[in-house]
Amino acid sequence: MKTKLDRIAKDTNLFLDKFVDKQSKSKLIPAMKYGLFSGGKKIRSKILIDVGSLLAIDYKKLIAIGAAVECIHAYSLIHDDLPCMDNDKIRRGKPSTHIKFGESTAVLAGNSLLTMAFEILASPTLKISEKIKIDLIKKLSECSGHLGIAGGQYLDLSYEKKKTSQSKIIEMEIKKTGKLFSFCCAAPAIIKKKNIKEIKFFENIGSDIGLLFQIADDLIDFKG
């Protein structure tokens, strides 16, 4: 398990490193790389590749899609750490991106990683049909925006210091964490041109995995 996870993390980072290096250079690249290569385990990519392997999808295609997912995840962490959000100064044992590079640079680096995710999905590097690319981009957009990560973060902030029902907390955690996991499970089904009901089945599995992941993470934080 760990060996496979290490391989996926290595291959995903290699893809991202090459993709970023092909970009026109800008002053934001160092902050983008700092947030992107911060030592995460690439759990989301692992789940995507496991589901994709069950559906006999080419590993390189899955790595590319997983790289897009990791861009979204990195963007969300950079923004979550900002003073106006969770105000976390440390991320994975290192200064958060806004501490290292400044708040405005962190916002712009996060925005750039968000858009780079869709650039990866639209690029010729990903060898799938244009129709499937559009479907993947649509689904990832939904999981990243007000119906997903951004909406979940909004709810998280609005529930601070308030007594909140269990159902509302679950809704928040599904949006904030579960939606990106749901994309990881649904993407292979989209590539294989499964019907709407089948895709929803995979989405629900991913959402449940994401919810369990977030609950476990919260318990670890609670216990210190």
Question: Where are the regions a protein language model picked out?
Answer:
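N-terminal leader/targeting segments and the immediately adjacent pre-domain N-terminus
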Residues: 1-13
